[in-house]
UniProtKB/Swiss-Prot annotation:
Domain SWIB/MDM2 residue range list: 244-326
Protein name: Putative SWIB domain-containing protein R508
Keywords for the protein's UniProt record, in alphabetical order: Coiled coil
Biased composition annotated in UniProt, kind: Low complexity: 24-33
Feature: compositional bias, Polar residues: 60-75
Length: 335
């Protein structure tokens, strides 16, 4: 029971402490609020006193009328006039400040220009050009011309040196923007014309190239036809000529005696035909193969054959060649 009592006492003490703390905080906040109110009231009083002083000064500046009227309605009018006068004074002060600023700005500009001109004069000295102009004096009846020429010596060719003509020449040489635009238009037109001319030339060249290529093709075809015709005509012309085996040659005496040939000159193809006829007449073909020829004593002697040698249709020309070569060698020896 004692423990419960102590815990309840502690809780009561804690509650009382918290209530006291909250009361203290409230008193502090109320004091701070009252202090802030007092400070605000003091500030408002000071501002009001300052404004009243300003009004008094404006009354003295404005003249006698504003100083004599102190009624409630008159006080309003005085305030209005004082505000308008203050605005005028402020405007005048602003104008003075602006005028002083503009003067300073102009002075700075002039100082910069003078510094630039001095630097330019140091860097690049100005050359004054002088040009000679011959003036021919003409005697006119007018008094004005005489009066103008009284101060000029009329003896001989008078020479006057004029300065600063380059500027006039430059002004004359300067072209107006309209003239420049016209020149640009003319240049663009001339450029377009040249482009069109070049395109036309390219087209003409392309057409010419096509024509030339077609002519080349036609010539090539004609040449091929001529070659074909020449080959055909050459074959026809050379058909009567003899060459190789068809060429007539002197027949050896041994073959004449064997084949009973009366002509001295015959082609080798004709001689082979006579040889095959001789083989068939004498039944010299092999009955089994019918490709080999069984030679007799005369053929062996003619061709100079040995044991084991065979005559066929494939090696017939080699045996005949042997006979023709022996005949040619004998003729050379006789000569």
């Amino acid at each position: 029971m004692s423990k419960r009592v102590t815990s309840s006492k502690k809780s009561k003490i804690m509650r009382e402490d918290s209530e006291n703390d909250s009361a203290k905080n409230l008193s502090k906040t109320s004091k701070s609020v009252s202090k802030s109110k007092e400070a605000g009231s003091k500030r408002t009083k000071q501002n009001s006193s300052k404004s009243s002083k300003d009004l008094k000064t404006t009354k003295n500046i404005g003249g006698s009328k504003s100083s004599r009227t102190y009624n409630s309605e008159g006080s309003k009018n005085i305030k209005k006039t004082s505000s308008s006068k203050d605005s005028k004074v402020i405007k005048k002060n602003k104008q003075k400040v602006e005028s002083s600023d503009s003067e300073k700005h102009s002075e700075n500009k002039s100082h910069k220009k003078s510094s630039k001109s001095s630097s330019i004069s140091r860097k690049k000295p100005i050359k004054k050009d002088t040009r000679k102009i011959n003036i021919e004096l003409v005697s006119d009846s007018d008094n004005n011309s005489d009066s103008e020429l009284n101060g000029v010596d009329t003896t001989g060719d008078d020479i006057i040196y004029l300065k600063g003509e380059d500027n006039n020449d430059e002004k004359q040489n300067k072209k107006s923007p309209k003239k420049l635009l016209n020149e640009k238009k003319i240049s663009s037109e001339s450029f377009d014309d040249k482009l069109n001319e070049l395109r036309e030339e390219l087209r003409e060249n392309y057409i010419r190239q096509k024509k030339i290529m077609n002519d080349i093709k036609d010539l090539a075809n004609l040449h091929k036809k001529d070659l074909r015709l020449a080959v055909k005509s050459g074959n026809r012309l050379n058909s009567g000529k003899h060459s190789g085996f068809n060429k007539p040659q002197t027949v050896p005496q041994s073959l004449k005696d064997l084949l009973k040939i009366n002509d001295d000159v015959l082609s080798r193809s004709k001689v082979t035909e006579l040889m095959y006829k001789y083989f068939t007449d004498n039944k010299m073909y092999n009955s089994k193969t019918k490709r080999e020829i069984i030679p007799n004593s005369k053929i062996k002697k003619l061709f100079g054959m040995k044991e084991g040698d065979i005559i066929t249709f494939y090696n017939m020309q080699t045996w005949l060649k042997k006979v023709y070569n022996e005949n040619q060698n004998n003729e050379k020896l006789e000569e």
